[in-house]
């Protein structure tokens, strides 16, 4: 077999493998997905939720960046909301995205 054919077969196999793991992850909540990376301590100090959510918000930003650094849908919320206000980690599934009308009833949509 030629190197091009082997490369194409490898790429196709890798793509199928990645899609199947993404499909599997979509059945998990955000918390279940993140706990696999090292336990509840990934998000919570000593594995316990903080009273105000500030520690958890810092943990989100340490991996995903600040709201100001994100896309246009996140920037307007910088300084006003924490990640968990929209992305309820123990309820939302991996890949689910909150919509504007979850909080806004004026017909706006994400760009």
From Swiss-Prot:
Q: Where in the cell is it found?
A: Periplasm
Which cellular components does GO assign to this protein?
A: periplasmic space
Task: List the signal peptide residues.
Answer: 1-25
Q: Does the keyword DNA-binding apply?
A: no
Keywords (alphabetical) are: Electron transport, Heme, Iron, Metal-binding, Periplasm, Signal, Transport
Q: Which Pfam families match?
A: Cytochrom_c3_2
Q: Is Cytoplasm one of the keywords UniProt gives this record? A: no
The residues listed in the UniProt record as binding heme c 3, with positions renumbered to this chain, are 74, 83, 86-87
Q: What happens when the gene is disrupted?
A: Mutant lacking this gene grows well aerobically and its growth rate under anaerobiosis with a variety of electron acceptors is indistinguishable from that of the wild-type parent strain, except that respiration with Fe(III) as sole acceptor is severely, although not completely, impaired.
Q: What does the UniProt cofactor note say?
A: Binds 4 heme c groups per subunit.
Q: What is this protein called?
A: Tetraheme c-type cytochrome
Species = Shewanella frigidimarina (strain NCIMB 400)
Its ancestry begins with: Bacteria, Pseudomonadati, Pseudomonadota, Gammaproteobacteria, Alteromonadales
Tell me the gene name: cctA
